[in-house]
């Protein structure tokens, strides 16, 4: 049992181990999706965050939920991140196997990109920084007076609140 648990933990690590001197300082400017990769959130949550991001930016709309089918808008809006463009490219693909391969490729590129951006910065300090952004996002939602304002704040801070490991339960508590 102990071996199975330790093997599972090892599989959860996205960022490759590196032997180097830890940098110092906070890496600012990461997106919520990149912060999720840094926090080693489950990949299904990261994919959901990317999906919500492209929908919010009007780059795609959901046609069917199960299996997930997207209608990618044309022309694409400006300001999409590389991982969002790769995500949309994958969903333009009709063949399920090719789509899965493109999504896997997108994920690997995203992880490498985050790893590259973190060079020279303190992982520990950066994690604490993005944890505090997530907490501030929740505080804004919780501080809202009316359900309408609460929903609006939640929509605005969705990507950051999703970083919470307790996202589902906390969302239920906030909107009770």
Give residue ranges: language-model regions.
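Acidic, Ser/Thr/Pro-rich intrinsically disordered cytosolic tails and loops
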Residues: 1-176
């Amino acid at each position: 049992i102990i071996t199975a648990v330790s093997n599972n933990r090892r599989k959860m690590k996205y960022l490759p181990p590196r032997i180097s001197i830890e940098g110092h300082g906070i890496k600012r400017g990461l997106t919520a999706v990149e912060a999720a990769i840094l926090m080693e959130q489950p990949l299904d949550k990261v994919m959901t965050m990317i999906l919500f991001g492209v929908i919010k930016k009007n780059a795609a709309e959901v046609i069917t939920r199960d299996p997930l089918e997207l209608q990618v808008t044309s022309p694409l809006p400006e300001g999409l991140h590389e991982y969002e463009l790769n995500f949309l490219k994958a969903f333009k693909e009709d063949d399920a196997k090719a789509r899965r391969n493109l999504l896997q490729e997108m994920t690997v590129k995203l992880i490498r990109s985050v790893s590259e951006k973190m060079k020279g910065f303190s992982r520990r300090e950066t994690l604490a920084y993005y944890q505090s952004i997530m907490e501030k996002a929740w505080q804004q939602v919780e501080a809202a007076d009316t359900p309408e304002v609460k929903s609006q704040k939640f929509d605005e801070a969705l990507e950051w609140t999703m970083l919470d490991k307790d996202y589902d339960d906390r969302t239920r508590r906030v909107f009770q």
